[in-house]
């Protein structure tokens, strides 16, 4: 029997995978874990993609050190 699902295939590193799983609980979309670096976002649409990208960008900006960000 064949099952077809509409969604988004996502390849990422394990820490990002965990973060996407965390986001999925807040944003209410279903994540199917395929392996340690691949996820399938069931029902993923443009809104979900933009939300994930925005949250990952915010996380990366928080974890990036810049000389120009030092308090003076």
Curated annotation (Swiss-Prot):
<dbReference type="Pfam" id="PF06331">
    <property type="entry name" value="Tfb5"/>
</dbReference>
<dbReference type="GO" id="GO:0006294">
    <property type="term" value="P:nucleotide-excision repair, preincision complex assembly"/>
</dbReference>
<dbReference type="GO" id="GO:0006367">
    <property type="term" value="P:transcription initiation at RNA polymerase II promoter"/>
</dbReference>
<comment type="function">
    <text>Component of the general transcription and DNA repair factor IIH (TFIIH) core complex, which is involved in general and transcription-coupled nucleotide excision repair (NER) of damaged DNA and, when complexed to CAK, in RNA transcription by RNA polymerase II. In NER, TFIIH acts by opening DNA around the lesion to allow the excision of the damaged oligonucleotide and its replacement by a new DNA fragment. In transcription, TFIIH has an essential role in transcription initiation.</text>
</comment>
<dbReference type="GO" id="GO:0006366">
    <property type="term" value="P:transcription by RNA polymerase II"/>
</dbReference>
<keyword id="KW-0227">DNA damage</keyword>
<dbReference type="InterPro" id="IPR009400">
    <property type="entry name" value="TFIIH_TTDA/Tfb5"/>
</dbReference>
<dbReference type="GO" id="GO:0005675">
    <property type="term" value="C:transcription factor TFIIH holo complex"/>
</dbReference>
<dbReference type="InterPro" id="IPR035935">
    <property type="entry name" value="TFB5-like_sf"/>
</dbReference>
<keyword id="KW-0804">Transcription</keyword>
<comment type="similarity">
    <text>Belongs to the TFB5 family.</text>
</comment>
<keyword id="KW-0234">DNA repair</keyword>
<keyword id="KW-0805">Transcription regulation</keyword>
<keyword id="KW-0539">Nucleus</keyword>
<protein>
    <recommendedName>
        <fullName>General transcription factor IIH subunit 5</fullName>
    </recommendedName>
</protein>
<comment type="subunit">
    <text>Component of the 7-subunit TFIIH core complex composed of XPB/repB, XPD/repD, gtf2h1, gtf2h2, gtf2h3, gtf2h4 and gtf2h5, which is active in NER. The core complex associates with the 3-subunit CDK-activating kinase (CAK) module composed of cycH/cyclin H, cdk7 and mnat1 to form the 10-subunit holoenzyme (holo-TFIIH) active in transcription.</text>
</comment>
<dbReference type="GO" id="GO:0000439">
    <property type="term" value="C:transcription factor TFIIH core complex"/>
</dbReference>
